[in-house]
Amino acid sequence: IQRAGGSEKDLGPLFMLASGLVILFQLPLARFARRVGAVRILPVGFLLIAVSFLSVALFAPSEPAAGWLRLLPAACFVTLLTTGQMLLVPAGKDVVPWFASEATLGAHYGALATAGGCAVLAGNLLLGDLLDRALTPSVGAMYPWLVLAVFPFCSALAMVVICRPMRRPRA
């Protein structure tokens, strides 16, 4: 938003977009995710998040468009990120019982939430300054977004490996 010459007032429409997506699509996507299965949806959710960062990287070398179109990169980011999250959250909760016994199920759900929060915090602390390099339109402005895309992409690959045993029924 800042790169596009926007301000805090431009956050409102983006929050409305995210809220609208959740209101309209959270339940249908959760049903879809459960029908397809967490084993397949977890990698897809992480890939959507990776693509959200890639979408901003694609716009980074160009001067921002005029008018409301200047928010297009942010709208793409919010849409893809939110959709990825709407797939990941129910799928992630669905796989927790695979790793936990009945007695420790609550602790495992708490650990899942804590791990997500810690990942966001660590990402902001370690990579937040990197985004300052993305403020001026240039080819170099793509790199911070590409770096950020690597982490959910690696998570998607990890989910393929981690979830492989879940494709077979437990004995």
Stretches with model-predicted labels:
Residues 1-11, 132:
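Short amphipathic helix-loop junctions that connect adjacent transmembrane helices
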Residues 24-39, 131-132:
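Helix-to-loop junctions at the C-terminal end of transmembrane segments
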Residues 47-67:
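C-terminal ends and interior cores of transmembrane alpha-helices
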Residues 67-87:
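Hydrophobic core of transmembrane alpha-helices in multi-pass small-molecule transporters
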Residues 87-101:
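Intracellular juxtamembrane helix-capping segments at the cytosolic ends
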Residues 103-134:
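A late C-terminal transmembrane helix in Major Facilitator Superfamily
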Residues 129-153:
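A membrane-interface helix-boundary motif in multi-pass transporters
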Residues 146-171:
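Multi-pass alpha-helical transporter architecture, strongest
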